[in-house]
Amino acid sequence: MEDERITSAEVQSPDEENEELSLRPQTLHQYIGQDQIKHELEVYIAAAKNREEALDHVLLYGPPGLGKTTLAMVIANEMNVQIRTTSGPAIEKPGDLVALLNELQPGDVLFIDEIHRLPKVVEEMLYSAMEDFFVDIVVGQGPTAHPIHFPLPPFTLIGATTRAGLLSAPLRDRFGIVEHMNYYNEADLANIVRRSAGIFNSHIDDQGAYEIASRSRGTPRISNRLLKRIRDFAEVENDGQIDRQLVSQSLKLLQVDNRGLDRTDKKVLTTMIELYGGGPVGISTIAANIGEEPDTISEMYEPYLLQIGFLKRTPRGRMVTERAYEHLGLIDQYMNK
């Protein structure tokens, strides 16, 4: 398997992460899509500011690449407070958490990405920090060990996760605001593409923007990555102009089809069809046949194929749908099953 997929929803390099910073909106007004979530947050933020209180703790969950980190930064900006960012795996022990909490001023935001990966001992320390704004620290060892009560300023914890089901109930219940971020529609993605093109000083027409949007798997991060690659083709081959024809030609070379499938997605589907008659077949079996880990299949490939109706889950395993056979030009095989 290739190390990097142009249609992956994950950040693929530090350079890409830095470039995302330049594309991020600063306010809810600038933030495109997720309209229901934005409306709710506008109300919660306005109410908290009117009461001069910290915003309630926020949990953002959903697939990768949908803007959870961006939204956390927008929330902090709208609240006119500082944000400290970290991730679950980076907080290895209680002392790491205490150091982060100690930096917070009243009302500040602590953002923890991949919060489902917090060590259990750290998670348990968060309970009192979130609920009552204090932590108890044990200092010393053996008979001399004793707790120290450490008060904290009121703050907002924003947790982000792609796997909300892995959060423990006690942690999940301490979030007053819980928002599920959904895949984006093509109109919103096209607006994101146009906005990013403007920041890149690239010229793109509406049809070009919609063509990129239609192949972006409902994910802004993928839209921006495709735009970057297509911009290269435009500058070299089309006087910097991005139109529908250039987008189609460029993505054909990059092996991204009109539904956003790349060669790995197609390999998953064709392996199931050619070796197992379209299924049902288990994730572990699919993974073994294409040289991937089962978790990689279930987290990176399966969600989008399920979303667009190319796969379905059954009690006996995954099955390729008629829609997928038709897309792959194999409808005769489906009819002859």
Swiss-Prot record:
It is found in: Cytoplasm. Residues 185-255 are annotated as: Small ATPAse domain (RuvB-S). InterPro entries: AAA+_ATPase (IPR003593), AAA_lid_4 (IPR041445), DNA_helicase_Holl-junc_RuvB (IPR004605), P-loop_NTPase (IPR027417), RuvB-like_N (IPR008824), RuvB_C (IPR008823), WH-like_DNA-bd_sf (IPR036388), WH_DNA-bd_sf (IPR036390). Residues 1-184 are annotated as: Large ATPase domain (RuvB-L). SMART domains: AAA. Residues 1-22 are annotated as: Disordered. GO terms for molecular function: ATP binding; ATP hydrolysis activity; four-way junction DNA binding; four-way junction helicase activity. Homohexamer. Forms an RuvA(8)-RuvB(12)-Holliday junction (HJ) complex. HJ DNA is sandwiched between 2 RuvA tetramers; dsDNA enters through RuvA and exits via RuvB. An RuvB hexamer assembles on each DNA strand where it exits the tetramer. Each RuvB hexamer is contacted by two RuvA subunits (via domain III) on 2 adjacent RuvB subunits; this complex drives branch migration. In the full resolvosome a probable DNA-RuvA(4)-RuvB(12)-RuvC(2) complex forms which resolves the HJ. This is Holliday junction branch migration complex subunit RuvB. It comes from Pediococcus pentosaceus (strain ATCC 25745 / CCUG 21536 / LMG 10740 / 183-1w). The gene is ruvB.
